[in-house]
Regions:
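Noncatalytic scaffold domains of N-terminal-nucleophile
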Residues: 1-28, 32, 40-134
């Protein structure tokens, strides 16, 4: 039996897929996605969506997403799902003001979260690779 007071992790062995997160429910979501025929991206998105519920202080739909994915064929893919400036922002207001930085507590420092768009792009772009677990 595992001693949860001891430092370290349990040994994990798998033949067809593996998932690890900071929360058991998120890991279970990833494993279930793989069992259902999803690929690594599907599993990662399922896990992070669950983490937004079970660990909202750590991750969620209001944040960003950065991914480096290496498909079986082709070059690795990098995705920058960082927040964007709102569409109605006037860039000239900032460049002509002489300000060097936007104060972090100013309303202008807020970005539109990029996580959900990044998750959707990752899943859509990898849809042809849904063969893991079958």
């Amino acid at each position: 039996m595992r001693d949860f007071m001891a430092i370290g992790r349990s040994v994990a062995v798998a033949e067809r897929g593996m998932a690890a997160t900071s929360h058991p429910q998120a890991t279970l979501a990833a494993v279930e996605m793989l069992k259902a025929g999803g690929n690594a991206v599907d599993a990662a998105v399922a896990a992070v969506a669950v983490q937004g519920v079970v660990e909202p202080q750590m991750t969620g739909i209001g944040g960003d997403c950065f991914a480096l994915y290496s498909p079986k064929a082709g070059a690795p893919i990098a995705l920058n799902g960082s927040g964007r400036t709102p569409a109605g922002t006037d860039a000239g207001k900032y460049s002509g003001s002489g300000a060097r930085d936007i104060p972090p507590t100013a309303p202008e420092a807020v970005t539109v979260p990029g996580a959900i768009d990044a998750w959707c792009r990752l899943v859509a772009d990898r849809s042809e690779e849904r063969r893991v677990g079958k």
